[in-house]
Design a protein with these regions (language model features):
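Short hydrophobic beta-strand immediately N-terminal to the Walker A/P-loop
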Residues: 40-42, 54
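Conserved ABC transporter NBD signature motif
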Residues: 66-77, 81-82
């Protein structure tokens, strides 16, 4: 079973409603598998659909057609299970330089539905060797 599987995934964004606007075909019948342990790079010019593809994988957007599975779990119908296997790092992390390292992690984890996770943040800080920096401001 592949770690990630895209099967006939298409995404059409509706017309904006402005005069002359038309629907935008961002993805058309994309199919591929990524096996566990395999390295995979997603390259392409602006507007090629990379962000749309990742947004669908992360459950932030829904495909117009097709399905995406993560370790066999459908991202649309088994999102909670699929999400356990995913980690998405946004292109640009937004943080307040006056936050402590701990506060920044709490804030960012909230974007991904991870609330009340002090034990996990402690484990993360320890694992990264940053436990002594937890109370330091991000700008330091």
């Amino acid at each position: 079973m592949p770690a990630i599987s895209f099967q006939s995934v298409s995404k059409v964004y509706p017309a904006s409603g402005r005069p002359g606007s038309r629907p935008l075909q961002a993805l058309e019948q994309i199919s591929f598998d990524i096996e566990e342990g395999e390295f995979f790079g997603l390259l392409g010019p602006n507007g090629a659909g990379k962000t749309t593809l990742i947004s669908i994988l992360a459950g932030l957007a829904r495909p117009t057609s097709g399905n995406v599975r993560v370790h066999g779990f459908d991202v649309g119908s088994d999102f909670a299970q699929a999400r356990r296997y995913l980690g998405v790092v946004p292109q640009e992390l937004v943080f307040d330089p006056f936050f402590t390292v701990r506060e920044a992690l709490v804030f960012q984890s909230g974007y991904f539905g991870l609330y009340h996770n002090d034990a996990w943040i402690d484990e993360l800080l320890d694992g990264l060797g940053l436990a002594d920096k937890a109370k330091a401001n991000m700008r330091q």
